[in-house]
Curated annotation (Swiss-Prot):
MGS-like domain mapped to chain residues: 6-152
Organism annotation: Escherichia coli (strain 55989 / EAEC)
Enzyme class: lyase
Protein name: Methylglyoxal synthase
PROSITE patterns from the UniProt entry: METHYLGLYOXAL_SYNTH (PS01335), MGS (PS51855)
Upper lineage: Bacteria, Pseudomonadati, Pseudomonadota, Gammaproteobacteria, Enterobacterales
Length: 152
């Protein structure tokens, strides 16, 4: 597949997602980094977003709850280039009924080459990057060329 460049803006659009057993871990991480995160636009699946907003007073664009379609909503935003970073604390020890949605979300984040953290250490590396508050170029699939090739 041919690639093109997308510029992640200095003010990132960040999606926050956490499975039930990981919600407290994500909330603690958000509270620890609240001053930095408040400089960006935040999205989250429903329950996670409402819990974070209630605990911190931060403005969160809450989707539906993950099992009710929220993971797919976040995935759609990634596909549309509207999410720049995904912080997704998923529980590797417990299966969830919407596992296919979880896999699809992670697949789309990989396809569209956005930074993804699935644990605290990686989330810390991302947010502490000297480029976190900078505009950064990434390579993404050239969808227009892909579509043109498919329609030949």
């Amino acid at each position: 597949m041919e690639l093109t460049t997308r510029t992640l803006p200095a003010r990132k659009h960040i999606a926050l997602v956490a499975h039930d057993h990981c919600k407290q871990m994500l909330m603690s991480w958000v509270e620890r980094h609240q001053p930095l995160l408040e400089q960006h636009v935040l999205y989250a699946t429903g329950t996670t977003g409402n819990l974070i907003s209630r605990a911190t007073g931060m403005n969160i664009n809450a989707m539906l709850s993950g099992p009710m379609g929220g993971d797919q909503q976040v995935g759609a935003l990634i596909s549309e280039g509207k999410i720049d970073v995904l912080i997704f604390f998923w529980d590797p020890l417990n299966a969830v009924p919407h596992d296919p949605d979880v896999k699809a979300l992670l697949r789309l984040a990989t396809v569209w080459n956005i930074p993804v953290a699935t644990n605290v250490a990686t989330a810390d590396f991302i947010i502490q990057s000297p480029h976190f508050n900078d505009a950064v170029d990434i390579l993404i699939p050239d969808y227009q060329r892909y579509l043109a090739d498919r329609l030949k």
